[in-house]
């Protein structure tokens, strides 16, 4: 009798689950092969965590199929309220690992701030807040993003309304808390993404001060790919018997193929031009070590005839936001940037990362190459090495326990390109510059290409801070999709 009743209940739950799944507008299934970085799980499902139906609907409609290893380890512990120290590779689903339990624990009947998600950069704050809104779109959860570079008055006005989750950067959040505008007295969930950066000497005093505004029974969760000694010091001082998760059996992503090329400084642009003509690039990010070199390289790339945006920390925040938004939406194939975008930025269409300037340390290298090969997919990382970089190359290989191979005469496209057939992955627009401009103007946005002005020869418009280049005598061309030899 008991067994029969149990069977009926299981069948009822299964039918109920399938019925609500059938009502959703789910994303097409991602057919690209994935590595063990995201597939090596115990086989649990999101339904096994007994999440609210509205949250499950948001998860499945966003295209999530089943938990990745970091989500599988983190979600049940976070739901229990225990402090967490989680270490996992870039691009394996860390953001959803803390966003899902944060959304689940929100009580929408209360008008108080219940979760703070702290991140080190403004771009990452915008991206994380969007994940919160996407997954929680059926839950009536109010999410607010606050960062430096925006008007403090606007944040104060928004905090007069109900806010359940705040996503922000340390300085601005502390400013709001210090002014008594943001009330964290009932905020029991404190999440730090890219915790190693947030606990660096420049941010640690701010974090320490910010914690004084939280209740004693708060839950603190730290997520990152790397944890230096300073994180342990913070953990010993502020975390209560944290549950430690370490999924870093190796530091680099399995799906990212790494090469280096010995190149004289004077030949770097020529080498980059060769790569653009040979590689099958969906979208690429090119890293430089200084903001000045970012703009100079973006100009050179445009003069070669390739579409290019640039972004760095000295640009106005509104321009940085526009560049990031347009690049993410595929308006342009190539983005030149400083280390501003090394952390957490998730653009699924990026399959090639190029270190035009080789990074000085292993941590920066790890975060840079992690912009490709997101969520177990394939990617390619190529580093230009000068004679002065050879010692850094050897040291980074030793610290990461990986071997960066010399670049071969030809690169097998299967290492970083999915032979998609009829399946469509996010790809950059192939429209002409005029069509892109028309589409942007229809949305009330200012275009980057063919904007009338007196600048010539690829010089930046608007004083150099717009983040895009044009040429006076020819249209920017989309390349990078040519077949490799």
From Swiss-Prot:
Residues reported to bind ATP: 88-95
Protein name: Putative ATP-dependent RNA helicase ste13
Pfam families: DEAD (PF00270), Helicase_C (PF00271)
Signal sequence interval, chain numbering: none
Organism: Schizosaccharomyces pombe (strain 972 / ATCC 24843)
Recorded family membership: Belongs to the DEAD box helicase family. DDX6/DHH1 subfamily.
UniProt region (Disordered), positions on chain: 16-38, 437-485
Residues covered by the Helicase C-terminal domain: 255-415
Cell compartments where the protein resides: Cytoplasm, P-body
GO biological process: deadenylation-dependent decapping of nuclear-transcribed mRNA; mRNA processing; mRNA transport; negative regulation of translation; P-body assembly; stress granule assembly
InterPro entries, A to Z: DEAD/DEAH_box_helicase_dom, Helicase_ATP-bd, Helicase_C-like, P-loop_NTPase, RNA-helicase_DEAD-box_CS, RNA_helicase_DEAD_Q_motif
